[in-house]
C-alpha cells in the first residue's frame, strides 16, 4: 500500500521508525518490538539507512523480513550521497522486485571525521536529485517521502531557504514528508504555515522522539539542531541519575506534545522508537481516544 495514497485520503497516520540491528540478538529484540507495536495497526513502519550506505544489506534484509513476515506496510529509507546513480537504481530495482512501494529519499550525512571526503562521481548530491532519479527511472511505482526540518537543517542558512529547498523536493515528486524530531510544537506550526504560504500542499507528519535517556537525547538534539525547552531540561537535570524518573517525565512530555499536535489537526504522528516499544505504547495508550478515526 502506498503511503502517499493513504495520506491523500485524509487518513490519520500512526507510524514507527526502526533501525537495522548489528547482531542476531538485536534483531530478535527488534522483532519482539515490532510484534508489540503491530497490534496498534500502524499506517506504516520505516527502517533507517546508515551513513554512507553502511547498513545497505541490513536495511534491505530487515525491510524484506517485515514485508514478508508481518502485515505491516514498510518504507525503506535510502540515502544517496555515498552512492553512484547506478548503485541507487540497483537498490531501488531490488526493492521493487520484492514488492516494496515506499521509499524515504534522503541525502545522508557527510562524514564529519573525513574532511577530504567527496561524493562518488555522478552521485546524487541532494535529496531532490534522488527524488528526481526515482521518478525518472521508476515512474509512480514508489510513493516517495522526504525529510523536513521545522527548525531548519543544521546546514541551512535560514528557514526561508529551508522552505524553498523543501518545495524543490516536493516539485521533484515527493508525496509526503516526515519531520526531524522537535520538542517545541510552535516551531512545527510556524514551518507548516510557511510551507502553505509557499504553495506546498503535501502532508507534513511530525516526528516524535520520546525522551527516555536524557544524555542520549541531548546529543541527538544537538546534532540535528532541535531545541529542548529550558523548563524540560531543568526537570530532567534534577533526575538525571534516576532513569525511571527521566523516562516518566519524557513520556509525560511526549503525551502532552502529541495531544496538542492532534488538537491542531496534524496529518499523523511518526514515532522514533529506537527499536523499543515501551515508551511508544504508553504514549499511544494515553492519546488513543483523541486520535481521529483511522479507517481507509
Curated annotation (Swiss-Prot):
Keywords: Amino-acid biosynthesis, FAD, Flavoprotein, Methionine biosynthesis, NAD, Oxidoreductase. This is 5,10-methylenetetrahydrofolate reductase. InterPro entries: FAD-linked_oxidoreductase-like (IPR029041), Fadh2_euk (IPR004621), Mehydrof_redctse-like (IPR003171), MTHF_reductase_bac (IPR004620). Catalyzes the NADH-dependent reduction of 5,10-methylenetetrahydrofolate to 5-methyltetrahydrofolate. Is required to provide the methyl group necessary for methionine synthetase to convert homocysteine to methionine; the methyl group is given by 5-methyltetrahydrofolate. It holds the Pfam family MTHFR. The keyword Cytoplasm does not apply. The gene is metF. CDD domains: MTHFR. Its EC number is 1.5.1.54. Belongs to the methylenetetrahydrofolate reductase family. It comes from the Bacteria. Its cofactor is FAD. It catalyses: (6S)-5-methyl-5,6,7,8-tetrahydrofolate + NAD(+) = (6R)-5,10-methylene-5,6,7,8-tetrahydrofolate + NADH + H(+). (6S)-5-methyl-5,6,7,8-tetrahydrofolate binds at residues 109, 180, 216, 276. FAD binds at residues 49, 51, 77, 107-109, 127, 149, 153, 162, 169. NADH binds at residues 48, 180. GO terms for biological process: methionine biosynthetic process; tetrahydrofolate interconversion. Pathway: One-carbon metabolism; tetrahydrofolate interconversion; Amino-acid biosynthesis; L-methionine biosynthesis via de novo pathway. GO terms for cellular component: cytosol. The active site is at residue 17. GO terms for molecular function: FAD binding; methylenetetrahydrofolate reductase (NAD(P)H) activity; methylenetetrahydrofolate reductase (NADH) activity.
